[in-house]
A protein has these predicted regions:
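Cell-envelope/extracellular polymer assembly enzymes that use nucleotide-activated donors
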Residues: 2-4, 22, 34, 187
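A conserved hydrophobic helix/loop-capping motif in glycosyltransferases and polysaccharide synthases
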Residues: 3-15, 19, 26, 38
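Conserved short acidic donor-positioning loop in nucleotide-sugar-dependent glycosyltransferases
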Residues: 11, 23, 39-42, 64, ...
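Acidic donor-binding segment of Leloir-type glycosyltransferases
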Residues: 20-59
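Glycine-rich, basic loop-to-helix element that forms the pyrophosphate-binding segment
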Residues: 46, 60-77
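Donor-binding/catalytic cores of nucleotide-activated saccharide
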Residues: 67, 87-200, 209-223
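Short aromatic/hydrophobic "clamp" motif used to bind/position activated sugar donors
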Residues: 82
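Membrane-interface aromatic/basic loop that binds lipid-linked glycans or pyrophosphate carriers
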Residues: 268-320
């Protein structure tokens, strides 16, 4: 078995068939991949999917979260490589074959695909990352590009769904997802990138990510703040425990900036009560300050970045 595709689902029966149809028409021979659906305590089981699509379907009565569902899939997988796909997303027809070909050709532990985002109410084509040629990167370049510390005219996103992993590489390094936490992809991506010997950008094969209303970044609840802070703390502890923090200090602070801005945007956009807004933003700032060394952070940023923190809405800085 070459590839195991792991798909967590939760009350997405109406969307998952588009996902499974895109897998079904892939050019890779059907006997070379398996599909495992981990149903994360949906209100109604979807057992008919097993027969209709010739896949493995596992229903969990206990909610595992996306991370826990993927962990179960990793342990069940028989493929040499693993892909994660969200149940409301889909892939291009050559995704599996190109992924397998380039991973074998380059002897890489991680492969990354073009990620195109689709929205409910936006018709423009939006690429979060796009790869037209084969690129090979080491761990340091990959993480610093992902953090936008380095600019190589290429983007790397922390999502795990537009990637393919060597399964034994995950097992040997005991890398699994944090369970029942949002933003789990960032911690998983950093851990895998740090210990990989080679990462590749796979050209001309696309993962289509559907951004629906009500998704993690299109809504807000207090758990978003708690989970973001938990993930950032875990990243810092992991970097420090493995003597990586000095190398990736600036990247860590850039991740903190990015995810704090994301949460603040969610609070501002989706909380209507001004008192709740203030309480949530105060919670974020106070707790994030416990994760950072202010002197280190100030040393890592430019004067212009500092000005933007102090005067975010002022573009014209002329006195007169």
């Amino acid at each position: 078995m070459d590839i195991t595709i792991i798909i967590p689902m939760k009350d997405t029966e109406d969307q998952i068939m588009k996902c499974l149809d895109s897998i079904k028409i892939n050019t890779l021979s059907r006997d070379r991949y398996e599909v495992i659906i981990i149903d994360d305590a949906s209100k109604q089981p979807s057992e008919f999917l097993s027969e209709k699509y010739d896949i493995h379907y596992f229903y969990s009565k206990k909610s595992l979260g996306a991370g826990g569902a993927r962990n179960l899939g990793i342990r069940m997988a028989r493929g040499k490589y693993i892909c994660f796909i969200d149940s409301d997303d889909w892939i291009s027809y050559d995704y599996l074959e190109k992924g397998l070909t380039y991973m074998e050709q380059c002897a890489s532990e991680i492969g990354m695909f073009t990620l195109k985002r689709e929205y409910d109410d936006i018709k423009d084509i939006i690429y979060k990352c796009k790869y037209n040629t084969l690129l090979q990167l080491g761990p340091e370049e990959s993480i610093k590009v992902m953090a936008k510390e380095y600019n190589f005219d290429v983007n790397i996103v922390p999502s795990t769904t537009n990637k393919i992993y060597l399964r034994q590489f995950l097992i040997d390094n005991n890398i699994f997802f944090p369970e029942n936490r949002k933003f789990e992809d960032l911690l998983f991506s950093i851990k895998t990138m740090l210990v990989a010997s080679k990462l590749i950008c796979i050209p001309d094969a696309t993962y289509f990510h559907y951004r629906r209303k009500g998704s993690i970044v299109q809504s807000f609840e207090h758990k978003n703040s708690e989970d973001m802070l938990f993930i950032l703390k875990e990243i810092k502890v992991y970097l420090e425990n493995n003597n990586y923090f000095e190398i990736y200090k600036k990247s860590f602070y850039l991740f903190c900036e990015h995810f704090m801005n994301l949460i603040i945007r969610q609070i501002n956009e989706f909380c209507s009560d001004e008192n709740i807004k203030k309480a949530e933003m105060t919670f974020i700032v106070k707790n994030l300050l416990q994760q950072i060394n202010l002197d280190e952070y100030l040393a890592s940023i430019s004067a212009e970045k500092l000005r933007m923190h102090i005067q975010p809405y002022i573009i014209d800085t002329n006195i007169l």
